[in-house]
């Protein structure tokens, strides 16, 4: 399922520009957001509890880097909490808001492997944590394609772990649940 995921980037913050080293990533599992430095700005990326699944009938044919309208009201709790924790965040203006698709499998894990009935068609998607799993996934999919199987047991990310029970509605319902509890 494709979830609507928003984050915003602040205007430049002089205190960040004055630092020699970037600040570490901050994740708040209770309020469900991440905050990280992006050059001389912050990125605040919540996993809001009012999760919204998009494209229930599949990705549109015309999709190409498409974004949706911002909906900062959905992020109000996380914005207020993060601004209290890091006061300079609340003082900074917002340079831009990004509201785009982030794919989720029903269990929150990647979805990889050969497609049944389609020769040389491979899935390698639903990496909800961005590049964090990229190296291992790249190694596994390359071994799978070139050698017939990955070096390690990767059943927990193999697309074949889902059977007939995984209908479109099931997939959407579980993806929403996983997204809402990303840091739970």
Regions picked out by a protein language model, each given a short descriptive name:
Residues 1, 30, 39, 53-54, ...:
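C-terminal catalytic lobe of FAD-dependent flavoproteins
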Residues 1-18, 77:
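Central beta-strand plus flanking loop segment that forms part of the substrate or channel wall
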Residues 4, 48, 98:
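Residues at the C-termini of beta-strands that transition into short coil/loop
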Residues 10-14, 20-38:
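Phosphate/diphosphate-binding loops
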Residues 11, 36, 45, 113, ...:
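Residue-level detector of conserved, well-ordered beta-strand and adjacent loop positions
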Residues 12-15, 38-40, 49, 115-116:
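Short loop segments at secondary-structure junctions
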Residues 19-21, 55-56:
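Short, charged, solvent-exposed linker or helix-capping segments at domain edges/interfaces
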Residues 33, 37-48, 55:
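Beta-propeller blade termini and top-face loops
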